[in-house]
Structure formats: structure tokens, C-alpha cells
Amino acid sequence: KIFCFLMLLGLSASAATATIFPQCSQAPITSLLPPYLSPAVSSVCENPILQPYRIQQAIAAGILPLSPLFLQQPSALLQQLPLVHLLAQNIRAQQLQQLVLGNLAAYSQQHQFLPFNQLAALNSAAYLQQQLPFSQLAAAYPQQFLPFNQLAALNSAAYLQQQQLPPFSQLADVSPAAFLTQQQLLPFYLHAAPNAGTVLQLQQLLPFDQLALTNPTAFYQQPIIGGALF
């Protein structure tokens, strides 16, 4: 009797523990699944233990046919973007090359005049004020300014050094004729004294300047006489 009682007690306990598992309900699971999956997904609730695995397989089977649309097209688009950027760079390079080949002299002069372009971009008022005396003189004496234009095209550094000498700019405002004479004599000064400060000191010597204006030949002989005396 005691043995039968224990068997009945065990059966009742197993039955009680078996009833705590809920029955499979298809309605809430199917409502959570995406609408583009196949209808076979609704039949995955056969066993509560197999539910997660079956749902995972069903979702993978539903996404796999759609992968060319959702995965391959964005990756192909991302691969095409660098090609589009490279194509745009090639088009700009070809346009610049055509511009350079069409007018090589203007392109080289534009690069040699880069310091003046930077000054014009940073301070346009100072750039215009600096160029005003030379523009007036160039309009008055175009043939005499031709060597300076050639110097600017050949050696922009030397041209810029000439333009930065303020006494010449002041002299250009006061007396254009004297300024042109000074500019024609400037290569001899630069050959005799490479230092710009020494050149300015030589230019400030009034007797030599007056002699250069009246008699340039005698002025050229003055450094030789001075070198022989000292």
C-alpha cells in the first residue's frame, strides 16, 4: 500500500509539473514576424523547445532570397562612389591641362606672380596702392617698362625685390623721369653691391644721383675712381 501511494504521488507530481508549460500560440508569434516572410513560418510552433531555432531558420530563409536587393545594391553603390569621385578629378585635371596647353605663357606668368596674387587676396587696398605708380608709369612709358615686364616673367624674386624698394616708389610719385633713370641704373647698383641696404645708401647720395641724371657716362666711371682712391 505504501509503495502504491508513493507511485501515485510521483505521477501526480509529474502531471503537476507538466501543466506549467504553456501551449503554443501561433497568433502572437506570427504578428511579430516580418510580413515579407513565407507563410510556412506560421507552422514553426510545433514544440516550445524548437521555437527559437525554427524562427531563426525561417527568418534566414526569408531574407536569403531578398539579399541581392538589400545587401548587394548598397555595397555596389558604395563601390561606385570612389569611381565617380575619381572621374570628376580626371575631368578637372583634363580641363586644367587644356588651359595650360592653350596658353602656356599666361599660366607660367600666373604662377610666377604668386606673391602678388597672395598680396591681392590678403589686402587688396595695399596691393592697388602699391601697383598704382607703376600702372601710371607703364601707361605713360610702355616701351621703357618692357625690360621690367621681362624681368618679372623670368625672375619674379628679383622683380619683387625691386618693387619693395620704397624710395623708388616715392620717386615715381614725384618725378617719373627720374624714376625711370633710377630703374635703368639699378642693375649696375645690384652688380656692384648685392646688399639692398647698400644700394639704398648709394641711391641716397645726392651728388651721384644728380650726376647720373645729367651725365650717365661720367656716373658709370665714378665707382672706378672711388675704388682707385680708397
Curated annotation (Swiss-Prot):
This is Zein-alpha 19A2. Belongs to the zein family. It comes from Zea mays (Maize). Keywords: Repeat, Seed storage protein, Signal, Storage protein. The lineage of its organism: Eukaryota, Viridiplantae, Streptophyta, Embryophyta, Tracheophyta. The keyword Mitochondrion does not apply. InterPro entries: Zein, Zein-alpha. The alpha zeins of 19 kDa and 22 kDa account for 70% of the total zein fraction. They are encoded by a large multigene family. Structurally, 22K and 19K zeins are composed of nine adjacent, topologically antiparallel helices clustered within a distorted cylinder. The keyword Repeat applies. Residues 1-18 form the signal peptide.
